[in-house]
Design a protein with these regions (language model features):
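Bacterial Sec-dependent N-terminal signal peptides
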Residues: 1-27
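N-terminal cap/lid segment of alpha/beta-hydrolase-fold proteins
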Residues: 73, 77-126, 130
Length: 304
């Protein structure tokens, strides 16, 4: 009798848990599959009045100035500039590689935080052209800059192993190291939530949207902070004595491709931008045909 009672209690507890997990339903509702039921109407109302070709501004130079300011307005408040001086840098370690030097840095891009980064500098006499290499999302937050540049020997063995495993999907080629061997200074920094800018509790992709929402409560935007850091990182790169500031480019794929086109649009430092495999449209991504199902959508979302 006692066994049956315990079993019955366990089954009732399981039933309650399943009910909570599935969620109670009402006959009427307003949201479906992570979207409001009127999502298609919202898409029809998006006319993009400031888009080039739609805008009444016909001078590209004037349009660029107005459109750029609109983007900055949507990005909300920037991180406060560092004090007492910009681009305070700590060199954490350095090593010689075949044809170039590799350094791990921490750069003071804001009064709030330091940003970990790698920089590769070709041997020989500069100044050299430079590339800001912007890492992807990939659903993998444990590494960031290490997706673009081979980790230095001073890194933890788990980081080196993880980067090598990630590289298997790219035919074993670290893109940044390839560029450095061909005469480019290469810079790559961790975006917020990636690599050494992640969570104390460990990389948890399913927490991304929650953290982004919490940051909005402070009047700031997580995706915008990523873009602000890319802008500041590019300014630091252009300020290096080894760099020809008139020949600075950026490149990235997936989320890095998004970062590349934002950086190209917002910085006059960038002379060439390459956005690789960044090809979704709002009409597809935010419709019932596709619908967002993964975490991390805030990585490319400004409030405006």
């Amino acid at each position: 009798m006692k066994k049956h009672s315990i079993r019955l209690i366990a089954l009732m507890f399981l039933a309650c848990c399943l009910t909570s997990a599935v969620g109670q339903k009402r006959n009427k509702y307003e949201f479906e599959r992570n979207l409001p039921v009127y999502a298609d109407s919202l898409l029809k109302d998006l006319t993009y009045p400031l888009a080039w070709g739609h805008s009444p501004i016909k001078s590209f130079k004037k349009w660029k100035k107005v459109a750029r300011q609109k983007v900055f307005d949507c990005m909300l408040a920037p991180p406060p500039a560092p004090l007492p001086k910009p681009y305070e840098v700590k060199v954490l370690c350095e090593e010689q590689r075949e044809g170039y030097k590799a350094r791990k840095l921490e750069i003071r891009l804001s009064r709030y935080y330091w940003v970990p980064a790698y920089v590769l500098i070709p041997d020989g006499k500069g100044p050299f052209p430079a590339v800001n290499a912007l890492h992807d999302h990939g659903g993998h937050l444990f590494i960031g800059k290490e997706k673009m540049i081979r980790p230095l020997a001073c890194e933890d063995s788990t980081v080196i192993k993880d980067a090598d495993e990630w590289l298997a999907g790219y035919e074993g080629q670290f893109f940044g190291d390839y560029l450095a061997r061909h005469g480019y200074v290469v810079f790559s920094a961790d975006a917020p939530m990636w690599g050494e800018r992640g969570q104390k509790e460990g990389a948890q992709r399913n927490k991304y949207d929650m953290i982004a929402g919490n940051m909005m409560m402070y009047g700031i935007d997580l995706s915008a902070y990523m873009t602000y850091d890319d802008l500041s990182g590019t300014e630091y790169l252009a300020s290096m004595s080894e760099v020809d500031a008139s020949r600075v480019a950026c490149v990235g794929w997936s989320m890095g491709g998004y970062r590349a086109w934002m950086l190209s649009a917002l910085s006059d430092r960038i002379k060439v931008g390459a956005s690789v495999c960044w090809m979704v449209t709002t009409d597809e991504q935010m419709s019932f045909k596709y619908s967002r199902t993964e975490n991390g959508g805030f990585a490319n979302c400004f409030p405006g």
